[in-house]
Protein backbone atom coordinates (compact mmCIF):
# COMPACT_ATOMS: atom_id res chain seq x y z
CA UNK A 1 0.00 0.00 0.00
CA UNK A 2 1.35 3.42 -0.89
CA UNK A 3 0.73 6.51 1.19
CA UNK A 4 -1.69 9.04 -0.22
CA UNK A 5 0.14 11.97 -1.80
CA UNK A 6 -0.53 15.44 -0.42
CA UNK A 7 -2.26 16.29 -3.69
CA UNK A 8 -4.83 13.54 -3.08
CA UNK A 9 -5.62 14.45 0.54
CA UNK A 10 -8.21 17.10 -0.29
CA UNK A 11 -11.14 17.47 -0.01
CA UNK A 12 -11.14 16.48 3.69
CA UNK A 13 -14.39 15.50 5.40
CA UNK A 14 -15.44 18.03 8.06
CA UNK A 15 -18.78 16.59 9.09
CA UNK A 16 -21.57 14.35 7.89
CA UNK A 17 -24.98 16.02 7.80
CA UNK A 18 -28.46 14.86 6.71
CA UNK A 19 -28.61 17.78 4.26
CA UNK A 20 -25.21 16.99 2.75
CA UNK A 21 -21.73 15.99 3.85
CA UNK A 22 -19.28 18.89 4.10
CA UNK A 23 -15.64 18.88 3.01
CA UNK A 24 -12.76 21.34 3.35
CA UNK A 25 -11.14 21.87 -0.05
CA UNK A 26 -7.67 23.08 0.89
CA UNK A 27 -5.67 24.61 -1.97
CA UNK A 28 -6.20 28.17 -0.71
CA UNK A 29 -5.45 30.96 -3.16
CA UNK A 30 -3.28 34.04 -2.69
CA UNK A 31 -5.93 35.83 -4.75
CA UNK A 32 -8.39 35.34 -1.88
CA UNK A 33 -5.77 35.97 0.82
CA UNK A 34 -5.65 32.29 1.72
CA UNK A 35 -9.39 31.89 2.26
CA UNK A 36 -10.96 28.52 2.97
CA UNK A 37 -13.46 26.97 0.59
CA UNK A 38 -15.94 24.20 1.24
CA UNK A 39 -17.68 21.48 -0.75
CA UNK A 40 -21.22 20.35 0.12
CA UNK A 41 -22.37 17.01 -1.30
CA UNK A 42 -26.08 16.62 -1.88
CA UNK A 43 -28.79 14.66 -3.67
CA UNK A 44 -29.54 17.73 -5.80
CA UNK A 45 -25.88 18.09 -6.77
CA UNK A 46 -22.71 19.37 -5.14
CA UNK A 47 -22.09 22.99 -4.17
CA UNK A 48 -18.71 24.69 -3.86
CA UNK A 49 -18.70 27.51 -1.29
CA UNK A 50 -16.11 30.08 -2.38
CA UNK A 51 -13.28 29.23 -4.72
CA UNK A 52 -10.01 27.50 -3.95
CA UNK A 53 -6.94 27.91 -6.10
CA UNK A 54 -7.28 26.01 -9.35
CA UNK A 55 -5.81 22.55 -8.89
CA UNK A 56 -6.03 19.68 -11.35
CA UNK A 57 -5.51 17.08 -8.56
CA UNK A 58 -8.30 18.66 -6.49
CA UNK A 59 -10.59 18.81 -9.53
CA UNK A 60 -9.88 15.12 -10.16
CA UNK A 61 -10.90 14.21 -6.61
CA UNK A 62 -14.03 16.37 -6.76
CA UNK A 63 -15.00 14.76 -10.06
CA UNK A 64 -14.86 11.36 -8.34
CA UNK A 65 -17.26 12.76 -5.72
CA UNK A 66 -19.82 13.83 -8.31
CA UNK A 67 -18.40 17.11 -9.57
CA UNK A 68 -19.77 20.61 -8.91
CA UNK A 69 -23.24 21.81 -9.87
CA UNK A 70 -23.17 25.28 -8.33
CA UNK A 71 -20.60 27.70 -6.93
CA UNK A 72 -21.54 30.19 -4.23
CA UNK A 73 -19.26 33.22 -3.94
CA UNK A 74 -19.93 34.74 -0.52
CA UNK A 75 -18.31 38.08 -1.35
CA UNK A 76 -15.88 39.83 -3.65
CA UNK A 77 -12.66 38.94 -1.76
CA UNK A 78 -12.90 35.16 -2.12
CA UNK A 79 -13.78 34.60 -5.78
CA UNK A 80 -10.20 33.43 -6.56
CA UNK A 81 -10.13 31.02 -9.54
CA UNK A 82 -13.91 30.63 -9.85
CA UNK A 83 -13.73 30.90 -13.65
CA UNK A 84 -11.50 27.81 -13.88
CA UNK A 85 -13.83 25.77 -11.68
CA UNK A 86 -16.94 26.89 -13.53
CA UNK A 87 -15.37 25.99 -16.86
CA UNK A 88 -14.12 22.60 -15.66
CA UNK A 89 -17.51 21.53 -14.28
CA UNK A 90 -19.86 23.61 -16.46
CA UNK A 91 -21.62 24.90 -13.35
CA UNK A 92 -23.48 28.09 -12.50
CA UNK A 93 -22.11 30.67 -10.10
CA UNK A 94 -24.03 32.74 -7.56
CA UNK A 95 -22.87 36.10 -6.19
CA UNK A 96 -24.69 39.05 -4.67
CA UNK A 97 -25.55 41.84 -7.07
CA UNK A 98 -23.61 44.37 -5.00
CA UNK A 99 -20.36 42.41 -5.36
CA UNK A 100 -21.02 41.15 -8.88
CA UNK A 101 -18.33 43.31 -10.47
CA UNK A 102 -15.78 40.99 -8.83
CA UNK A 103 -17.16 38.06 -10.86
CA UNK A 104 -19.00 39.59 -13.83
CA UNK A 105 -19.20 36.19 -15.54
CA UNK A 106 -21.36 34.78 -12.71
CA UNK A 107 -24.58 33.39 -14.13
CA UNK A 108 -26.84 34.17 -11.14
CA UNK A 109 -27.18 37.07 -8.71
CA UNK A 110 -28.77 37.43 -5.30
CA UNK A 111 -30.58 40.77 -5.06
CA UNK A 112 -31.41 42.85 -1.99
CA UNK A 113 -31.76 41.42 1.52
CA UNK A 114 -34.21 38.61 0.90
CA UNK A 115 -33.11 35.09 1.82
CA UNK A 116 -32.79 32.89 -1.26
CA UNK A 117 -33.38 29.13 -1.16
CA UNK A 118 -30.73 27.76 -3.48
CA UNK A 119 -32.12 24.26 -2.98
CA UNK A 120 -34.21 22.41 -0.41
CA UNK A 121 -31.71 22.58 2.45
CA UNK A 122 -29.36 25.38 1.43
CA UNK A 123 -30.15 29.07 1.83
CA UNK A 124 -28.22 32.21 0.91
CA UNK A 125 -28.59 35.02 3.44
CA UNK A 126 -27.38 38.52 2.49
CA UNK A 127 -25.21 39.98 5.28
CA UNK A 128 -23.91 43.34 4.03
CA UNK A 129 -21.11 44.92 6.01
CA UNK A 130 -17.69 43.38 5.38
CA UNK A 131 -18.47 44.16 1.75
CA UNK A 132 -21.72 45.55 0.39
CA UNK A 133 -22.54 42.23 -1.25
CA UNK A 134 -21.44 39.86 1.50
CA UNK A 135 -23.67 36.88 2.17
CA UNK A 136 -23.56 33.62 4.11
CA UNK A 137 -24.78 30.15 3.18
CA UNK A 138 -26.85 28.09 5.62
CA UNK A 139 -27.12 24.31 5.35
CA UNK A 140 -29.94 22.39 7.03
CA UNK A 141 -32.94 23.20 9.22
CA UNK A 142 -31.51 21.58 12.35
CA UNK A 143 -27.89 21.25 13.51
CA UNK A 144 -27.24 23.98 10.97
CA UNK A 145 -23.93 24.63 9.26
CA UNK A 146 -23.11 28.27 8.51
CA UNK A 147 -20.59 29.11 5.80
CA UNK A 148 -19.84 32.65 6.92
CA UNK A 149 -17.33 33.97 4.39
CA UNK A 150 -15.59 36.92 6.06
CA UNK A 151 -18.67 37.98 8.03
CA UNK A 152 -17.87 35.98 11.20
CA UNK A 153 -15.28 33.58 12.56
CA UNK A 154 -14.25 32.02 15.87
CA UNK A 155 -11.56 33.28 18.27
CA UNK A 156 -10.38 30.19 20.22
CA UNK A 157 -8.21 32.19 22.65
CA UNK A 158 -11.18 34.17 23.97
CA UNK A 159 -13.93 31.69 23.04
CA UNK A 160 -15.97 34.28 21.18
CA UNK A 161 -17.43 34.76 17.73
CA UNK A 162 -15.70 37.61 15.92
CA UNK A 163 -17.00 40.24 13.54
CA UNK A 164 -14.05 42.49 12.82
CA UNK A 165 -14.15 46.25 12.32
CA UNK A 166 -10.48 46.13 11.31
CA UNK A 167 -11.39 43.99 8.32
CA UNK A 168 -14.68 45.65 7.43
CA UNK A 169 -14.29 47.13 3.95
CA UNK A 170 -17.75 48.64 3.49
CA UNK A 171 -19.95 49.55 6.50
CA UNK A 172 -19.40 48.48 10.10
CA UNK A 173 -22.83 49.57 11.34
CA UNK A 174 -24.49 47.49 8.63
CA UNK A 175 -22.26 44.53 9.46
CA UNK A 176 -23.48 44.54 13.07
CA UNK A 177 -27.07 44.65 11.81
CA UNK A 178 -26.21 41.63 9.68
CA UNK A 179 -24.89 39.84 12.77
CA UNK A 180 -28.27 40.46 14.42
CA UNK A 181 -30.00 38.84 11.43
CA UNK A 182 -28.39 35.53 12.38
CA UNK A 183 -29.39 35.46 16.06
CA UNK A 184 -32.35 33.13 15.60
CA UNK A 185 -30.41 30.43 13.78
CA UNK A 186 -29.44 27.13 15.40
CA UNK A 187 -25.88 26.91 14.13
CA UNK A 188 -23.95 23.76 14.99
CA UNK A 189 -20.90 24.42 12.82
CA UNK A 190 -19.40 27.80 11.87
CA UNK A 191 -17.19 27.43 8.79
CA UNK A 192 -15.62 30.78 7.81
CA UNK A 193 -13.49 31.91 4.91
CA UNK A 194 -10.83 33.23 7.27
CA UNK A 195 -10.17 32.50 10.92
CA UNK A 196 -11.12 29.45 12.94
CA UNK A 197 -14.07 27.13 12.45
CA UNK A 198 -16.05 26.09 15.52
CA UNK A 199 -18.62 23.55 16.63
CA UNK A 200 -21.37 24.86 18.93
CA UNK A 201 -23.47 23.01 21.48
CA UNK A 202 -27.24 23.69 21.53
CA UNK A 203 -27.94 27.27 22.61
CA UNK A 204 -24.33 28.42 22.39
CA UNK A 205 -24.68 30.12 19.01
CA UNK A 206 -27.15 32.72 20.21
CA UNK A 207 -25.09 33.34 23.36
CA UNK A 208 -21.94 33.86 21.29
CA UNK A 209 -23.56 36.41 18.98
CA UNK A 210 -25.17 38.25 21.89
CA UNK A 211 -21.73 38.50 23.50
CA UNK A 212 -20.27 39.91 20.29
CA UNK A 213 -23.01 42.52 20.00
CA UNK A 214 -22.75 43.50 23.69
CA UNK A 215 -19.02 43.98 23.34
CA UNK A 216 -19.41 46.25 20.34
CA UNK A 217 -22.17 48.26 22.05
CA UNK A 218 -19.81 49.01 24.95
CA UNK A 219 -16.73 49.57 22.79
CA UNK A 220 -17.90 51.04 19.47
CA UNK A 221 -14.38 52.09 18.55
CA UNK A 222 -12.93 48.63 19.12
CA UNK A 223 -11.71 46.88 16.00
CA UNK A 224 -11.88 43.26 17.08
CA UNK A 225 -12.75 41.12 20.07
Residue ranges of predicted features:
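Metallo-beta-lactamase
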Residues: 5-20, 46-48, 54-56, 60-63, 68-78, 80-132, 141-142, ...
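Short His-Asn-centered micro-motif
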Residues: 49-52, 73-75, 96-97
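Active-site-proximal loop/helix segment associated with metal-binding centers of metalloenzymes
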Residues: 27-36, 97-111, 155-162, 217
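Conserved beta-strand hairpin/beta-sheet module of binuclear metal-dependent hydrolase folds
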Residues: 9-58, 136-154
